[in-house]
């Protein structure tokens, strides 16, 4: 039987070899090369972190967070580099979701 860590590392290498992964990486590199897109992206990630902290403490985002989220949505849709990145990221997420189901299937079986 192969070492489970070797299998995980092989999976990691396989993900990096996917065309969808490479497309996300190229889109992220394009964002990094554009000052406006990079600024919006960095601010968006910081905002996402704020929301995660709220969720971890059991707090709900208020109306100002909703307004800020809508603002980011408009900025992202209005920037072709950012909208391309998130589109490509969604395509990669399909693989990640499928892999998650496969990996957690044995754990799920234990809970039945």
Swiss-Prot record:
SUPFAM superfamilies referenced in this protein's UniProt entry, alphabetically: YheA/YmcA-like (SSF158622)
The family this protein is said to belong to: Belongs to the UPF0342 family.
Signal peptide: none
Disulphide bond pairs: none
UniProt xrefs under InterPro entries: Com_YlbF, YheA/YmcA-like_dom_sf
Origin species: Streptococcus pneumoniae serotype 2 (strain D39 / NCTC 7466)
Pfam short name (any one): Com_YlbF
Protein name: UPF0342 protein SPD_1206
């Amino acid at each position: 039987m192969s070492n489970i860590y070797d299998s995980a590392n092989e999976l990691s290498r396989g993900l990096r070899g996917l065309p969808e992964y490479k497309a996300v990486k190229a889109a992220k590199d394009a964002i990094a090369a554009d000052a406006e897109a990079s600024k919006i992206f960095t601010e968006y990630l910081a905002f996402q972190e704020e929301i995660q902290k709220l969720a971890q403490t059991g707090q709900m985002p208020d109306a100002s967070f909703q307004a800020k989220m809508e603002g980011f949505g408009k900025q992202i849709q209005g920037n072709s580099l950012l909208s391309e990145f998130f589109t490509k990221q969604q395509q990669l997420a399909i693989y990640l979701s499928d892999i998650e189901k496969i990996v957690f299937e044995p754990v799920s079986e234990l809970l039945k």
